[in-house]
Amino acid sequence: KFQIAGFLHWGYNFWNSGLSRQRLNPWQVTDGNGAFPGGDPFSVYPGPEGPVQSLRMKVFHHGLQDLRALELAQALTGRDVGPEVLPGYGEMTFAQYPQGAEELLAARERLNALVESASC
């Protein structure tokens, strides 16, 4: 619907306060000392052997997998599969969309079944 070409998350490992005035421990201070929403300035935490993925990064990865599965289903069927995967939601926007874990997991199961049946 929106045909968004990409996504930019500006703060992969910004472990500082606003304007980089001081270095912070992101395990203890997740909002840049009040400069950002909690967890927003970084996607990974520092770890002893390299970066540790944040929950935000893991969920974003799942979202990208969902997008790829939707694109595959559309390519296999030749139609918009959104209404089948998320029935009853009508027009979705960036502000109005399904948010419950159960409904999102059920939607993914419907999508998986659609891809499976279209692949046979």
Name each model-derived stretch.
Residues 1-19:
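Catalytic-core regions of glycoside hydrolase
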Residues 4-5, 21-120:
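Catalytic domains of carbohydrate-active enzymes that cleave complex glycans
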